[in-house]
């Protein structure tokens, strides 16, 4: 026992030792505790033994048992026996499972992202327009609230356009002596515009004009009568026996005085004529000796108790007015505050209380005189502004709208019949010498004598001889006559004595004659061209002629230099023109301009007129420094220097209106208290004339003078031209002809409608108004039919430059013009309002009173209607009183929701707004919002009614305008009624004929200049009169500080307005940095903004460009189109929607092929990652370098050979790289000019294959296509053409689709249980997807749309965005055959059920010409008569009876089909009658709807039909004049007609 125990202990020790060495420390048995009992030791070893046994067992199972079992299982042999049927079933099951997995998991991957796609976040353009509009309205409200914090009087004065551009010093000079006058509700103001300039500060003033006895207005116009025209009780005012007609209502902040009256306030008082001028304005005869009328206390009018307002010591008493002179002394203009009725509760009664009154501010006459004396250049700016208003507002309205052009031309008739003109003849020796040289023995020689060639060439011996003579006599004072050079001249005193043309007041200088002076040529060319005399370009001073006296002995010489006959002639002509224009050297305005330095003195220069302030000993005289016009009409300097804070005085006299109603009108009139009518003008004269060299002015004018000779019946100026100039008739006469504007008149009859107005004789001037005012020529100027004419011509550009240089001439010229204007024109000018509406401003709101209508002078307005009946607009008038703040008072931004607004259209330049509401005395039906900074001329209702009574032709013309608008509206309504259902996804048509186009880049570095050049060339090619403006070209006209100074805004606005008058389209090129003022100007001036972007720039596509951010901050209302520039005609699928996703300010987009030259180090544009390229680069990096270099060499050789092959193919005669009719810039130009060509392809199943042939014929004949729309099969062919714009790809893809649809097996496998449809639509869907892929409609190169029938909402939907295959499939979904496409919860079917030929929708897109191809089945209109009952057996027998006379009765399927296409048939008939539609229907009636297997046959039917038709049209001249097919720019320039297209074969 002991031995066994020891043996176990030894074994345990050995195992313990072994395990301790083998097992890790964590599994090793722990050492026994020292000094333990044997019992514990035994237990310890037993536990350890059990643990060891468990470990060994586990190791045995893992290492031995499990592997042995696996080996035994693998070594077992067994057999499975299956029969053939089991194997086939198993294989069928496996194949079916695999097919279902591939079919429904992988092959339907094209539609996994298109189940309910909302066009990737693209917002409806109409909604974005309204959203931006409301933002603009909120911005306007914020701006208006900010403006109200300023001084109200300064705000009113700054808002007036005349004073808005002046410097602060000039502005303060005008306003420091301004006074105010308060009027009670019963006071009538006698408005004397010669006392000062008045502005309404508070309240509303009603302005009345006097009605003369011989006027038609007074006849039968009784205010007590219930007259239709007199629906306002305040239209007529009676003072004494004089009747006054309401002219206008002037609101707070608007000028009460006429802006033309500023000319009288600025005119210096230098003669007694001022007194007569003032009295003449009140019809007081100059023969009346006003000084004999005693000045006594004011007396009452014939009606008792009427006085001239409150008595004031500063106002002199009025004279006694004798009864015989009463009617002459009634003022022309009176004004009174407008009554405002308010309801007031007094106890139990309701009373109407009239709370009214007004406050006016007056800038006195003396303030204008101080400005005229101290700031002559600022005076010229005011005069320029007055003329600009006269041109833009008055003349435009009178000529274009009212049709009173003859009234305007009466001023030129007066000019040429005044005594000053009759005395403005040339000296006899100059006149005879000129006639002797032009009308020689050979007759009239009309040789064109260029100004440059006159002094660069020597053409005869006589000229050389003359040159020698002149060089020897440089210091002579003789006038060298050309007659002395003739060998046959016998000589006389005039040829040997000194001659002078100097008058008593002209200081003259002479000029040496050039060697090749045209006046001394021995012979003139005989060609019928213009002959002109030009002056040397030297800066030497010239002589002037005395225009009144012919006594040569009284003349002296002006200089030490010799005066030639040419210089004498030129100066004499200039002096004659000056006398006609009203420019006199003796005038006070000329004497005040001492030390004048042309173009160098600033507006506020303190040295202007400095010599007037110096005494004889060159010391400053404080007394002389005072303004010489401190008193006027009895007003002392203390009276006129009352500040604004002083107590208001009675500046104007008034009478109490209440006394008018209490007085009994009698026949006798004893007197009237009008104190301002008889005041005499007293002005201090400067006795010592100042030194001023007026000869420089005449010399510079003479340099620009051209003497021309025209033959008989030669048109010199065409009506409507801009660059006419001033024509002074030296000999002969000019006929002034006028052609009434009639847009519907054929051009061949326009020549017959020319009517002669008057003739300009010798000594007269033609082209006066167009030169002085800057207006386009209203008449045609032509020489007489019997003989020619010799004229002296100053071009309009030269005249404008000289007037800008010598700005002090503008005041006398403008004053002379005002005297020539008729009283009717001045009345119209006084009543017309010049409205300035900023971008986003509201011209008028829906619901406003229509108290006037507007004519758009510049800018653009968007018409918006609120569809909610709960909206009520303001009841205030819709007028905009000359400044932006008043226009915002009717802004309904807080009451308008986006969903309630509807954009109806836009008004552009020259269009009129609101006549219907005015004639019907109703409220505004729409709201008008300015798209950009705009200007309108407002004609008040009262002025229109007054002019209509005196000139019935105005009412006739306005009635025609209104009737034409009504007819046009009826046409639109008729077209909308023809389409029974209104499309749910399109807005009303907005005209694309934009006046101004802005080209703006998204980021810097884009080729803006190159893009603009190509677009301008395209616009010219389609026949548009276009000009491109960039900062450099604009600075050329306006100066280098055009966009930095406040004054430049006036010139800038006038320059842009002039360009809008002269050109059809203006392209603004934004080629400046982001913070430049020109960038903001371009954005604010654009009717349409073209936003350029690089299509491959992913950074900008997902973000926003710097220029776009500025565009958003400026809150422009203009339409914004995104132009994506591509290096080639290819758009990566899905790339366009990335650009349009977040750009809600973009309403459209265009794909343009244009190469962008990028710099090598440019990293701003990131290319899209290409998986294959990245994989190739990774593999190439790990490849052996030798293999890599070999492959690179092979690749380079392949590329070079491909380039050579492509080059030879491109330059071959059978192919042309860029076809002109596919020019993207011509397409863009047509769209922007409303000249787009649309292609509409109808539905018809397999018959639509003929569309491919027709498109091929269009390509062959070079007919461009700008817009494409389609239905059913037409949507498929149209989508292919819009996607690739290539006939080759269209043919191949359409044929591929036809083969798939015609496949019988594909149709059989696609059959399903016919609950909704016979087939599932899978094969049909996949066939469409195979040719379109994941391309979206936005990716199509040409703008495209297709229509579908929404059977959920019972509407027709138009699709212009989204996956193309999906909506094309929806447009082709024939009910019963294919299931509807589900989109956003709606079911979409074939669009042919509502409109199988969507011409109306294409018309909404702005297409002018529409090529509509109809391939639908022919309508069976056979009459049926089978009685009231019908037996099915009889119908069956009738079908099989060959002898039956009854037509076959349709079955149930046919009836359902006809019922489904009822709306489409009506829409087709309306489409045929639409203007501009080219209706085509190829002979395809013999083909069924599903005959897709006959592709080639149907294709050739369409091709042959269209090819023959277009060829015959081209041969017979019936093809419409589509813009771009012929280069109209070259035709205008006189080149031969060049066709831009050529035939191209496939």
Curated annotation (Swiss-Prot):
The active site is at residues 1272, 1390. Inhibited by organophosphorus esters. GO terms for molecular function: lysophospholipase activity. It is a multi-pass membrane protein. It comes from the Eukaryota. GO terms for biological process: glycerolipid metabolic process; lipid catabolic process. Keywords: Endoplasmic reticulum, Hydrolase, Lipid degradation, Lipid metabolism, Membrane, Repeat, Transmembrane, Transmembrane helix. Residues 1239-1403 form the PNPLA domain. GO terms for cellular component: endoplasmic reticulum membrane. The chain crosses the membrane at residues 46-66, 82-102. It catalyses: a 1-acyl-sn-glycero-3-phosphocholine + H2O = sn-glycerol 3-phosphocholine + a fatty acid + H(+). Belongs to the NTE family. Intracellular phospholipase B that catalyzes the double deacylation of phosphatidylcholine (PC) to glycerophosphocholine (GroPCho). Plays an important role in membrane lipid homeostasis. Responsible for the rapid PC turnover in response to inositol, elevated temperatures, or when choline is present in the growth medium. This is Lysophospholipase NTE1. It comes from Scheffersomyces stipitis (strain ATCC 58785 / CBS 6054 / NBRC 10063 / NRRL Y-11545). The gene is NTE1.
């Amino acid at each position: 026992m002991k031995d066994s125990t020891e043996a176990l202990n030894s074994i345990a020790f050995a195992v313990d030792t072994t395990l301790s060495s083998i097992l890790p420390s964590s599994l090793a048995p722990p050492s026994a505790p020292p000094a333990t009992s044997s019992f514990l030791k035994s237990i310890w070893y037993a536990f350890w033994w059990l643990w060891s046994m468990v470990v060994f067992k586990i190791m045995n199972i893992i290492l031995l048992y499990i592997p042995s079992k696996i080996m035994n299982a693998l070594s077992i042999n067994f057999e499975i026996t299956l029969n053939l049927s089991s194997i086939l079933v198993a294989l069928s099951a496996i194949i079916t499972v695999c097919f279902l997995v591939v079919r429904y998991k992988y092959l339907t991957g094209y539609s996994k992202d298109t189940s309910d796609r909302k066009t990737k976040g693209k917002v409806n353009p109409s909604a974005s327009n309204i959203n931006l509009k409301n933002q603009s309205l909120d911005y306007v409200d914020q701006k208006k609230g900010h403006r109200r914090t300023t001084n109200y009087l300064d705000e009113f004065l700054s808002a007036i356009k005349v004073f808005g551009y002046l410097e602060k010093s000039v502005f303060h000079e005008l306003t420091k002596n301004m006074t105010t006058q308060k009027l009670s509700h019963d006071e009538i103001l006698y408005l004397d515009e010669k006392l000062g300039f008045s502005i309404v500060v508070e309240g509303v003033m009603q302005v009345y004009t006097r009605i003369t006895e011989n006027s038609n207005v007074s006849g039968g116009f009784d205010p007590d009568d219930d007259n239709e025209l007199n629906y306002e009780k305040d239209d007529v005012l009676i003072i004494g026996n004089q009747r006054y007609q309401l002219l206008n209502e002037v609101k707070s902040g608007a000028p009460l005085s006429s802006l033309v009256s500023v000319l009288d306030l600025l005119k210096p008082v230098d003669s007694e004529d001022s007194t007569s001028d003032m009295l003449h304005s009140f019809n007081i005869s100059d023969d009346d000796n006003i000084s004999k009328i005693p000045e006594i206390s004011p007396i009452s009018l014939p009606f008792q108790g009427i006085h001239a307002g409150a008595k004031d010591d500063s106002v002199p008493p009025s004279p006694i007015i004798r009864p015989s002179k009463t009617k002459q002394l009634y003022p022309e203009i009176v004004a009174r505050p407008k009554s405002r009725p308010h309801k007031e509760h007094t106890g139990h009664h309701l009373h109407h209380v009239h709370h009214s009154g007004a406050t006016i501010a007056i800038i006195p006459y003396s303030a204008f005189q101080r400005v005229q004396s101290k700031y002559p250049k600022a005076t010229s700016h005011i005069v320029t502004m007055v003329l600009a208003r006269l041109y833009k507002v008055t003349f435009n309205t009178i000529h274009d709208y009212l049709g009173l052009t003859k009234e305007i031309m009466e001023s030129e008739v007066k000019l040429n019949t005044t005594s000053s003109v009759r005395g403005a003849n040339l000296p006899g020796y100059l006149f005879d010498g000129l006639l002797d040289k032009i009308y020689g023995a050979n007759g009239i020689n009309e040789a064109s004598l260029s100004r440059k060639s006159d002094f660069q060439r020597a053409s005869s011996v006589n000229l050389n001889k003359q040159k020698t003579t002149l060089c020897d006599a440089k210091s002579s004072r003789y006038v060298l006559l050309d007659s002395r050079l003739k060998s046959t001249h016998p000589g006389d005193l005039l040829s040997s004595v000194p001659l002078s043309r100097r008058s008593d007041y002209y200081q003259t200088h002479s000029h040496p004659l050039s060697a090749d002076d045209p006046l001394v040529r021995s012979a003139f060319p005989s060609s019928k061209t213009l002959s002109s005399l030009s002056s040397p370009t030297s800066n030497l001073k010239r002589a002037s002629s005395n225009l009144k006296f012919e006594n040569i002995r009284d003349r002296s010489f002006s200089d030490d230099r010799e005066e030639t006959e040419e210089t004498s002639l030129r100066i004499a002509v200039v002096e004659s023109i000056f006398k006609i224009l009203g420019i006199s050297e003796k005038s006070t305005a000329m004497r005040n301009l001492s030390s004048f330095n042309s173009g160098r003195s600033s507006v506020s220069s303190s040295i202007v007129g400095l010599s007037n302030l110096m005494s004889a000993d060159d010391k400053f005289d404080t007394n002389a420094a005072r303004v010489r016009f401190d008193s006027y009409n009895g007003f002392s300097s203390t009276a006129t220097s009352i500040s604004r804070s002083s107590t208001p005085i009675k500046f104007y006299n008034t009478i109490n209106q209440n006394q008018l109603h209490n007085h009994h009108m009698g026949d006798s009139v004893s007197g009237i208290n009008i104190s301002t009518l008889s005041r005499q003008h007293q002005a201090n004269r400067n006795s010592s004339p100042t030194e001023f060299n007026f000869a420089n002015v005449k010399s510079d004018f003479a340099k620009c003078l051209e003497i021309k000779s025209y033959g008989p019946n030669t048109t010199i100026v065409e009506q409507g031209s801009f660059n006419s100039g001033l024509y002074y008739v030296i000999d002969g006469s000019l006929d002034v002809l006028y052609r009434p504007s009639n847009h519907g008149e054929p051009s061949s009859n326009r020549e017959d409608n020319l009517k002669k107005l008057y003739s300009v004789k010798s000594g007269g001037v033609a082209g006066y108004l167009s030169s002085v005012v800057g207006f386009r020529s209203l008449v045609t100027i032509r020489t007489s039919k019997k003989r020619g004419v010799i004229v002296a011509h100053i071009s309009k550009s030269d005249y404008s430059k000289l007037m800008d240089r010598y700005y002090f001439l503008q005041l006398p010229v403008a004053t002379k013009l005002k005297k020539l204007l008729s009283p009717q024109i001045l009345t119209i000018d006084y009543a017309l309002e010049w409205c300035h509406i900023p971008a986003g401003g509201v011209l008028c709101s829906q619901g406003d009173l229509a108290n006037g209508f507007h004519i758009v002078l510049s800018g653009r307005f968007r018409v918006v209607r609120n569809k909610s009946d709960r909206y009520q607009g303001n009841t205030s008038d819709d007028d905009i009183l000359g400044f932006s703040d008043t226009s915002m008072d009717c802004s309904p931004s807080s009451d308008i929701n986006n969903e309630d607004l509807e954009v109806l259209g836009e008004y552009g330049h020259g269009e009129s707004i609101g006549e219907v509401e005015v004639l019907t005395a109703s409220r505004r039906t729409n709201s008008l919002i300015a798209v950009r900074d705009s200007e309108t001329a407002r004609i008040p209702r009262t002025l229109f009614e007054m002019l209509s009574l005196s000139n019935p032709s105005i009412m006739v013309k306005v009635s025609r305008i209104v009737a034409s608008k009504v007819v046009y509206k009826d046409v639109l309504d008729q077209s909308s009624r023809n389409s029974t259902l209104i499309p749910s996804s399109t807005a009303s048509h907005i005209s694309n004929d934009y006046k101004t186009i802005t080209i703006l880049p998204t980021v810097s570095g884009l080729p803006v200049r190159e893009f603009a050049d190509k677009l301008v060339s395209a616009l010219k090619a389609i026949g548009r009169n276009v000009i491109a403006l960039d900062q450099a070209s604009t600075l050329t006209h306006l100066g280098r500080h055009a966009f930095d100074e406040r004054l430049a805004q006036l010139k800038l606005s006038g320059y842009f307005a002039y360009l809008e008058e002269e050109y059809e389209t203006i392209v603004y090129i934004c080629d400046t940095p982001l913070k430049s003022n020109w960038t903001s100007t371009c954005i604010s001036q654009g009717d349409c903004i073209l936003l350029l972007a690089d299509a491959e720039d992913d950074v900008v596509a997902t973000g926003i460009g710097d220029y776009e951010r500025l565009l958003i901050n400026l809150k422009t209302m203009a339409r914004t189109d995104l132009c994506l520039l591509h290096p080639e005609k290819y758009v990566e699928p899905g790339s366009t929607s990335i650009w349009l996703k977040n750009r809600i300010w973009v309403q459209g987009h265009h794909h343009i092929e244009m190469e962008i030259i990028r710099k090598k180090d440019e990293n701003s544009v990131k290319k899209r990652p290409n998986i294959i390229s990245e994989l190739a680069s990774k593999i190439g990096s790990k490849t052996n370098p030798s293999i890599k270099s070999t492959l690179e060499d092979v690749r380079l050789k392949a590329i070079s050979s491909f380039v050579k092959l492509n080059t030879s193919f491109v330059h071959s005669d059978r192919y042309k790289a860029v076809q002109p009719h596919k020019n993207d810039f011509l397409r863009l130009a047509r769209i922007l000019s409303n000249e787009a060509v649309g292609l509409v392809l109808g539905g018809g199943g397999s018959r639509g294959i003929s569309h491919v042939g027709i498109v091929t014929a269009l390509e062959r004949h070079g007919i461009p296509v700008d817009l494409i729309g389609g239905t059913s099969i037409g949507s498929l062919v149209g989508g292919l053409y819009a996607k690739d714009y290539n006939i080759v790809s269209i043919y191949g893809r359409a044929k591929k689709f036809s083969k798939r649809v015609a496949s019988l097996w594909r149709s059989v496998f696609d059959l399903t249980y016919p609950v909704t449809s016979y087939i599932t639509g899978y094969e049909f869907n996949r066939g469409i997807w195979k040719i379109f892929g994941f391309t979206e409609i936005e990716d199509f190169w040409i703008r495209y749309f297709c229509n579908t029938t929404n059977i959920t909402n019972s509407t027709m939907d138009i699709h212009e965005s989204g996956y193309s295959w999906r909506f094309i499939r929806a447009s082709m979904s024939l009910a019963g055959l294919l299931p509807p496409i589900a989109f956003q919860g709606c079911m979409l079917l074939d669009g042919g059920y509502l409109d199988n030929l969507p011409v109306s929708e294409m018309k909404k897109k702005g297409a002018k010409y529409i090529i509509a191809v109809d391939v639908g089945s022919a309508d069976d209109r056979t009459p049926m008569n089978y009685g009231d009952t019908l037996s099915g057996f009889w119908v069956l027998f009738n079908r099989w009876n060959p002898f039956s006379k009854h037509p076959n009765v349709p079955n149930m399927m046919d009836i359902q089909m006809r019922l489904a296409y009822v709306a489409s048939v009506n829409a087709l008939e309306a489409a045929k009658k639409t203007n501009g539609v080219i209706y085509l229907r190829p002979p395809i009636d013999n083909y069924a709807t599903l005959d897709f297997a006959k592709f080639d046959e149907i294709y050739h039917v369409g091709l042959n039909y269209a090819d023959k038709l277009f060829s015959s049209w081209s041969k017979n001249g019936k093809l419409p004049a589509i813009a771009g097919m012929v280069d109209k720019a070259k035709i205008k320039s006189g080149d031969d007609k060049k066709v831009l297209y050529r035939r191209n074969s496939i």
